[in-house]
Amino acid sequence: MTIHQIHTKQPISINNDPWEAYTDIETHNKLTLSNIEFTTTNLCNMRCSHCAVGYTLQTQDPDPLPMDIIYRRLDEIPDLKTMSITGGEPMFSKKSIKQVVKPLLKYAYDRGIYVQMNSNLTLPQDRYLDIAEYIDVMHISHNWGTLDEFATVGFGAMEKQPPLKAKLKLYDQMLNNAQTLSDQGMFISAETMLNQSTLPYLTKIHNEIVKDMKCSRHEIHPMYPADFASDLNVLSLKEMKQAIHQLLDMRDENTWMLFGTLPIYPC
């Protein structure tokens, strides 16, 4: 593993989002390989109906690649500035955390690379606090207009359902973890999909994300037809526009709102 000089990173803000590809054009005058995403585990304690990998998750992880190989290949990417860590649920397996997640986080920290982790934030709080200093963005999905929605959609792809009490405990833990981590300075970005399930509850969802969970950013992404989300209904273009107008009219103006993959504009 190459020893890299530790760089001082500027805080994530609406004026500094290193995951935006256009900044590569500004810096290098061309698109370049600047972001790598690692799937560190195929395990998860939930099975969300909207999850792109929810139907492919496993009950046992294969052996990971040796970290020496990963370090060597990362060293070959001179313009690497961001890293995304996802799963499954990256904080579910203690073995994976020790063998893969923490080594990746420490590598990124030493090299001055920004790190985003995709998590459901439902696991014991000490796991998140243990890695907090290495995380630039904690990304979560929050599409829950009601507790029933969390209990059904959040476990929609799970064959053997846990008891309702256990599901609701995870919901409370997610809210508490988000609030605590936000209070301690972690940048949490909560993503909400626009579909028929979230449409009636957009105001409630936004207020919960901003006021209860104290997230730094609320991402809005339209849901498009996909095999993995076939149980969820998409919005018409008219409904989508109305939903966006509703969010813009009632949003907390001190909170960063990020709208992505809108069908109204070309990518």
Residue ranges and their predicted role:
Residues M1, I6-I12, Q60, D75, ...:
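Radical SAM enzyme [4Fe-4S]-AdoMet core and its adjacent flexible, acidic
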Residues T2-M117, T122-R127:
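Conserved alpha-helical substructure of the radical SAM core
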Residues P66-I70, I97, V101, Y128, ...:
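Aromatic/hydrophobic pocket-lining residues that form the small-molecule binding cavity
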